[in-house]
């Protein structure tokens, strides 16, 4: 297996994508947040003391995705063309599933 982010001496480098063709790319990441039934009820009803938890989390997720190239070493700066953050409340397992989908058209992708 060849590691593309290292040169022949093992030094880290940013991959050169200048010769690649632009393509449309899309990726979705999902994760689950587990909590007590009482907490889940408050989040669902919007009665948490801090306000709209999922609304704030959505905005924070969008902001974080826009800063990916600053947070992940050697990641190319991406021109995101669409970004969604969605939540699914699953009361039977006391969880909230978070899903973030990012789209771009470029020489490198969001995957």
Predicted regions and their residues:
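C-terminal binding/interaction regions
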Residues: 1-54, 59-76, 82-111
């Amino acid at each position: 297996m060849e590691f593309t982010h290292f040169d022949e001496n093992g030094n880290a480098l940013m991959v050169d994508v200048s010769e690649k063709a632009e393509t449309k790319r899309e990726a979705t990441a999902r994760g689950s947040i587990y909590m007590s039934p009482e907490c889940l009820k408050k989040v669902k009803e919007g009665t948490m003391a801090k306000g709209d938890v999922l609304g704030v989390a959505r905005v924070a997720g969008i902001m974080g995705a826009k800063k990916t190239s600053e947070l992940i070493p050697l990641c190319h700066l991406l021109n995101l063309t669409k970004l969604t953050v969605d939540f699914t409340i699953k009361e039977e397992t006391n969880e909230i599933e978070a899903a973030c989908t990012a789209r771009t058209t470029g020489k490198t992708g969001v995957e």
